[in-house]
Amino acid sequence: MEKMRVIVITVFLFIGAAIAEDVGIGLLSEAEAYVSPKLKKFITPCTSHVGETCSTTSSSGSEALMQNQGGLALCLFDSMERCLVDHGAQLYQTSVTNLQVEPSEVFPRKNNPQGGRKSKLDDHQVQPLSFRLPPFRLPPMPKLGPTSPIIRTIPSPPIAPRDLSLIETIQLRTALRTCTHVTARTCLTAPNVATSDLEACLTPSMNQCIYPRGAEYGSPPIRA
């Protein structure tokens, strides 16, 4: 019962995150679409790649899709997200708990009638689902003598530097959605992609939107 309650809470967290992300697109302006500097190591290698990928209709895969700002923004967002994942930004990992879930608890099945066909779930051949975290190791205990004072050791939680929290993931994806629309609106000055000078515009526009000048704790935009 406790496991099912944790599962339900986790599902509601993801639903709330998706709603917050979609609402945030309309609330953020270009100057507010700011991402923490510690995520810059994921952003920097990808902006130039995305600018090159979406600057021509042949690389986008659909010429009809790229004839308007919405199609260009979609290309920018999808390409940016794929590039971030390729560079190690785990956007969808959470650190809720190391939860072991049996398939029979999530999808309860009635017993098959005698002589009926059995599935793998009936034979318990399916491995349990799990949200895996890095292994937790306790620090070594100090050697105590007969006159040593009592020492309480508080272990530190494991650190996963490449895993983004749920809040960081929402912040990053909301900023990317906002900036891809801003960049598409800024750079698509001609009737379509083929006649627009996108390659020289996409990269600096994305960088300026994600890291605007004067942002608190921020840094100047990346030069192309």
UniProtKB/Swiss-Prot annotation:
Pfam families: Nodulin. Residues 103-124 are annotated as: Disordered. It comes from the Eukaryota. Keywords: Nodulation, Signal. Residues 1-20 form the signal peptide. GO terms for biological process: nodulation. Involved in the infection process during the plant-rhizobium interaction. Belongs to the nodulin 20 family. This is Nodulin-C51. It comes from Glycine max (Soybean). The lineage of its organism: Eukaryota, Viridiplantae, Streptophyta, Embryophyta, Tracheophyta.
